[in-house]
């Protein structure tokens, strides 16, 4: 699992991010997956029998390990870093990397440090005040082909976290079928 973790992390670092409102989606399928402001996990669930999570990392990181952009969107404090692979019917679909400031973990209805194999989006978007902002989208050419990615800030009970998602080659975003 560490090989895919390293590969995905290095790919995400090379993405050239664009604001969502300036990103040119080629079709409705890309728009559906990249620009949705609701739970990606819920969308993925609709395209498989079993959505599962493989946890790659769930550790604290110091602010000096964050990028300048990440620090600007968060409070410059120690964060819980969660890295996962979201799988649809055992196929790796999305690599997710979430940074949750320790202050955002306090006074929440769920203990996000013990999220385990539950998709974070399911938990976050079950909160009444959950929403997403600062959505950015990008592509990156890899040895596995061109891949899409997105990143945004999620708010749960008025507390921020950052999530970056890399759509892996088997993800439904690359399906030849058009969404209805």
Curated annotation (Swiss-Prot):
Location of the protein in the cell: Cytoplasm
Pathway assigned in UniProt: Cofactor biosynthesis; ubiquinone biosynthesis
Enzyme Commission designation: 4.1.3.40
Predominant place of localization: cytoplasm
InterPro entries noted in UniProt: Chorismate--pyruvate_lyase, Chorismate_lyase_/UTRA_dom_sf
SUPFAM superfamilies: Chorismate lyase-like
Gene3D superfamilies per UniProt: Chorismate lyase-like
MF (Gene Ontology): chorismate lyase activity
A single GO BP: pyruvate biosynthetic process
Superkingdom, natural source: Bacteria
Reaction equation(s) it catalyzes: chorismate = 4-hydroxybenzoate + pyruvate
Broad EC category: lyase
Binding residues annotated for substrate, in chain numbering: 82, 120, 165
Disulfide bonds: none
UniProt keyword annotations, A-Z: Cytoplasm, Lyase, Pyruvate, Ubiquinone biosynthesis
GO cellular component term, pick one: cytosol
Pfam families: Chor_lyase
Its biological purpose: Removes the pyruvyl group from chorismate, with concomitant aromatization of the ring, to provide 4-hydroxybenzoate (4HB) for the ubiquinone pathway.
HAMAP family: UbiC
Family: Belongs to the UbiC family.
Name of the protein this chain belongs to: Probable chorismate pyruvate-lyase
Name of the encoding gene: ubiC
